[in-house]
Amino acid sequence: MHFNFSERESELRKAGVEAGILCHALSFEECWKIAATQGLVASIVPAEFGGPGLNAIETAISIEGFSEGCKNGGFTFSMSAHLLAGLVPLVKHASGDIKRRILPKVVAGEYILANAMTESGSGSNAFGMKTTAKADGDNFTLNGTKIFCTNASIANGILVYAVTDEAKGFFGGITCFFLEKEKHNYTCGKPVQKNGLHASPLCEVFLTDVSVSKENIIGKMGSGVMVFLESMNWERTVMSAMHAGTMTRLCNLSRAHVKARMHGETALEKHQGVQFRLAEMFLQTESCKLQAYKAAKMIDKGEDVTAAAAKAKVFSSEALNTIAKEALILHGANGFTADYGIGEIIADAQAALIYSGPNDVLRNLIASRLQ
């Protein structure tokens, strides 16, 4: 594993930071256009469909840079969810027809994706779902309700996971379907009011006798578990890099503040207690980056990244919460004001402990794979 970026990787990170900075105080739609122009919303789309064709490590580096530059955590999360839980399954498993129709639109910034997995009765047991897809000739009829669907209300397409064979259960009994807003009559509930990630839309998705062609199956019949787990490995890996980008911004803000802030005739940075806090912030940020990059490299090498991705997500989400609170302390009363934005990051960071799998559930997964 190398520890120095190539020239291309350095350029990707720099472009990500610059794109993030450009998004300051802009609307969701304006931010999406900027991210699309930089190839961020379609990073993994192959060149044959007009995309950048980035691999996992390049995608992680790009998103890390964007997260460092962009102060809108909700938008960064929505873009990442679109990319990792939505686009990864399409690029890896969709039919040639779907790829030819949809991927160029994603590259152009004209198509947003969402994922519909979670249900109210299943909680962290995502595959205890009740949503069904009943075969009807060349079509399937979907019925059920999905909750906590990021981007669903603004999405042009949604990946829906449903039970197609209850007897087969976890492996072989769940299938992923691609529903298109223009073709399929699913409906979205009212926006969920959240404590953080305010720019990221969240809602329920209602499926009532929604008819979808078998051609819209992503992967193979009954392969929904594998499709979903692969996307979660990507999501946990790249969102760990996303967390690291936000942490880098917090570290740099805090360092600049304690260098400039005087206590009497001495800058705050000269006090040992402040130095300890700052050093710990940078230590945890560097550790997060290394874990995220390691997992991304494993994806690119075709290795089993399940445990590494879970480790990166658990560590980075908890470190993000710690560092955000440390940044507030180092900024003193200023850190508690809205102008500095640290309180908003603290609120956003709470969600990181839950999305992509709650950390305690991921700890169980990690423990089950100890050698």
Question: Model regions: which residues?
Answer:
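A short, Trp-centered hydrophobic/proline-enriched beta-strand micro-motif
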Residues: G109-T118
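Conserved hydrophobic/aromatic beta-strand scaffold that supports enzyme active sites
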Residues: A114, K130-T132, G157-Y161, C176-F178, ...
